[in-house]
Amino acid sequence: MTLLSSTELRKLIQATPSLLENAIDIETQIQPNGLELTLKEVKTIDGSGAVDFDNSERQLPDGKTLEFGNDGWIHLPKGIYKVLFNEIVNIPMNLAAIAKPRSTLIRCGTTLETAVWDAGYRGRSESMLVVYNTEGFRLKKDARIMQLLFYTLGAEVEKGYSGIYQNENTK
């Protein structure tokens, strides 16, 4: 498993399909070892969810979209939120990705929770934003909040991601 560099990421962005669609400013979003994703929207998480072994009883909690102010900012009190990214990711069958919050979030008492991004996944993903800071946290629309780190696999997978989140939020 090898972490991809910005040079390798640029080639994958120019490929078809592009590794990353809908980037706001790809030159800013490409980092030495990853790609930064930007904030499209913030939602509340209302109610409980459920997960089981075969997903037949999976339930996702509801939530409502929070509005940014006229200046593009939103103040989030301490709590948990769901965030949606602007970018659509197309992960080739020989790569997987791990996401990490930008260090600025952590320095502000806020973090992101996310899962492994599987080979073959395509979509505009969501993550959980956790505001630990008792004073809250301000976010501006389109802020760079997460960095995706792409790794080459030892071999291409035979079957890529095919779960319910395939092509999520792309329409």
UniProtKB/Swiss-Prot annotation:
GO biological process: dUMP biosynthetic process; dUTP biosynthetic process
Reaction equation(s) it catalyzes: dUTP + H2O = dUMP + diphosphate + H(+)
Keyword hit for Hydrolase: yes
EC number: 3.6.1.23
Gene3D superfamilies xrefs: 2.70.40.10
CDD domains per the UniProt record, alphabetical: trimeric_dUTPase
Keyword Disulfide bond: no
EC class: hydrolase
Keywords, alphabetical: Hydrolase, Nucleotide metabolism
Domain of life: Archaea
Pathway it works in: Pyrimidine metabolism; dUMP biosynthesis; dUMP from dCTP (dUTP route): step 2/2
SUPFAM superfamilies with a match to the protein in the record: dUTPase-like
GO MF annotations, alphabetized: dCTP deaminase activity; dUTP diphosphatase activity
Pfam families: DCD
PANTHER family to which the protein is assigned, alphabetical: DCTP DEAMINASE, DEOXYURIDINE 5'-TRIPHOSPHATE NUCLEOTIDOHYDROLASE
Membership in a protein family: Belongs to the dCTP deaminase family. Archaeal dUTPase subfamily.
Job of this protein: This enzyme is involved in nucleotide metabolism: it produces dUMP, the immediate precursor of thymidine nucleotides and it decreases the intracellular concentration of dUTP so that uracil cannot be incorporated into DNA.
Protein name per its UniProtKB record: Probable deoxyuridine 5'-triphosphate nucleotidohydrolase
Organism: Methanosarcina barkeri (strain Fusaro / DSM 804)
Gene from which the chain derives: dut
